[in-house]
Amino acid sequence: MLLSLGSNGNFQLGLNNDEDVYSPQIVPFDRAIEKISCGGNHTLLLDEDSQLWACGDNRKGQCGYEVKEPLYNPLSPDYLRIFTRVSHERWVFLTCGWEFSVIVHADRRRVCSCGEGLSGELGQGNRSNSQGLREIDIPYLDDKEFIIDISAGLRHWICVTNEGNLYGCGDGRKGQLGPVVMKTVNKVSFLGRIEHAQAVVCGVQFSAVLQETGHVIVLGGEKWNVAAECDAWQANNSELSSSICSISANWSTLSLLSTEGCVYAFGRCDRAQKAHTKASDIVQIASGTEHNILRTKKGSVLIYGWNEHGNASNDDKRDVYDAKTLQLPGWAYIVAAGYATSWIVIEENHK
């Protein structure tokens, strides 16, 4: 069962209405879910068969959904009110920025983008808008290289390969694409190599790469001291640093999750972005614009941070400074967060 809450002015919660929601609501989607990613006002997911579905704002083509025969198809392509199948192909990764999406094919080598990218984030050269999924070229991949993770910020994205190579495009003016590309680029570029890289996340003006050793390398991040705080913490806590197993990024805050289930956060904290629980049983953290949602070993869900649209489940719209437990009708096994949206996938009869 899929649940959603938060900002919904463009049908991005998949509830067949455009009203903001302050508590988890059941989404009319009956397939098992593997992955969820959220953009400014759109949402993508991969189902159990690795097929792509989307809902929300599609005016710039960011959902990848095209009406090829509008005279015979009454569905408006501008807004997808419920999750709609976009492609019958198989995909493995997906990520969304403000008004664009990037999806990785099941072969982990082919990449498609769609939507609008005024800062080059589509990776389609001078083409800044694509109404449907369009394959983009990553010319540097060798025969044995494949993508193992991908993430998008507001106007940039980065993928990392099994060889530790980083590729990406979009806005790199604040160092978020790394020191090699300190500019805006509209074609996928080689950004550098990080030994044993296994995951990447993107904020607005920074990106971060997690190595197998638990060490985290921050690209950009001067504003809000994301890089400085993270680097200092790692230098002073080498044993804890080696236990980091997952990372997550808000627009201006970086969170790290350890194998012991603890969360450490660096950067901006004006909207309770660091107000994480003291609990030590966290197994997943998902970061939205400026709020976070945590999943515990026991299948419960905690949430905190910015709450203007009810995305942190306070109906008074006040930010949540003490992580609160959501009341759910089942055991949570996936959490996701977007641009003022929150998502939980639950199993009702978990044993």
Swiss-Prot record:
> Do the record's keywords include Repeat?
yes
Q: Which UniProt keywords apply?
A: Cytoplasm, Nucleus, Repeat
Q: Which Pfam families match?
A: WD40_RLD (PF25390)
Show the coiled coil region(s). Answer: none
Gene Ontology cellular-component terms for this entry are:
cytosol; nucleus
| Compartments (UniProt record) | Cytoplasm; Nucleus
What residue spans do the RCC1 repeats cover?
A: 1-48, 50-106, 108-162, 163-212
Q: Which domain of life is it from?
A: Eukaryota
What does the entry give for GO biological process?
tRNA wobble uridine modification
What is the recorded name of this protein? Answer: RCC1 repeat-containing protein C10F6.04
Per the UniProt record, the source organism is Schizosaccharomyces pombe (strain 972 / ATCC 24843)
